[in-house]
Every structure is written in structure tokens, then in C-alpha cells.
Amino acid sequence: FLSKNTLPNFPSFIEATHHGPTALKSPVLFAEIGSTDTEYANQDAGELMARCLLEVCKEWKYKRKAVDADRVAIGFGGTHYCQKFTKLMLDSNFEFPYIFSKYGLPEANSLTIRQAIEKSLEPVEIALIEKKSMNAQTRDQLIASLKEVGLNYEMV
């Protein structure tokens, strides 16, 4: 949806997960428009966000799919605003139900990774690791956790 519906001078990014996995039993989607009063007051951005959220809800209601993506992945690494994962989502048709940013990697153990997989609406196929955003020790610990839960991975 976002690849075909943009606003001039108003970039769209996906954000790293910072609210879960949660204990909620229903699907959860967090969305926000910017981080200042200027963005919050942008009516065009609000309308685009509303259309985007309605599209996601329609996909789920009628197709029982969260999105129409080719591949579903959990992302690991990067910053709060996930530019690399946003590009993969838009250019390669990936879906990211969870992204553990660089600052969230200490919580990315086998338990939380398993929860992220189980609580995703679509079956998670692979983990994508932003290699340059973490040191070798962190990457090795992450890979060990991914192997423990049986999730294949690729470096991006």
C-alpha cells in the first residue's frame, strides 16, 4: 500500500518493535504519524494513515491475511526507524511482523523470538539480520537463539 500511496516530502518508515511481543491474545498494530505536533496536525498524513490501516483490516477480514507479501520475516538490527527493512518491504515485498532493533537485541533470546513467531498472523519464514548494526558476539548469540527455535536466517 505504501509503495503506491505516498505524500510529497513526508517519508514513510516502519519502526522497530518496542511494544512486544505482548500478552494480548488479539492481533495488535501500532501506528504513528511523526513525533511532533507538526506531523500530528498534518491532515493528509492522517488520512493516508487511516486508509493504510483500513487496507490492512480489509486484507485480514476478507483474505485472512495480514498483508499480501511474498515473504514474512522477523528483522534483527538497525535503528529505531528501520530504513533497510523498509526498503526490503517496499522493494522486495517482505512483511515484518516484528523487528528487534539494535537497542532491542539484548531481549532477542530464544523465548522472545519464539513468542514473535507464534504471535505473528502470517507464518514467519526467515530471520533477516542487519549484519553491520551489531558486533560479532551479539550476532553469534542471536544466531544461536535462531537455531534453537529452528528459524533460518539471512544477512542483509
What are these regions (language model features)?
Residues 46-50, 110-114, 139-141:
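Well-ordered, non-membrane alpha-helical segments in soluble/globular domains
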Residues 130-156:
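C-terminal functional modules of predominantly eukaryotic multidomain proteins
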Residues 7-21, 61-75:
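Short, surface-exposed recognition loops or helix-turn segments adjacent to catalytic cores
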Residues 65-136:
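Acidic, Ser/Thr-rich low-complexity intrinsically disordered segments
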Residues 13-60:
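Active-site-adjacent mobile loop/cap segments within catalytic or ligand-binding domains
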Residues 47-48, 90-92, 142-148:
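Short, solvent-exposed amphipathic alpha-helical segments in soluble enzyme
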Residues 21-22, 39-40, 82-85, 137:
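Short acidic/glycine-rich loop or secondary-structure boundary segments that cap or lie
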Residues 1-7:
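A short, contiguous, amphipathic alpha-helix enriched in charged residues
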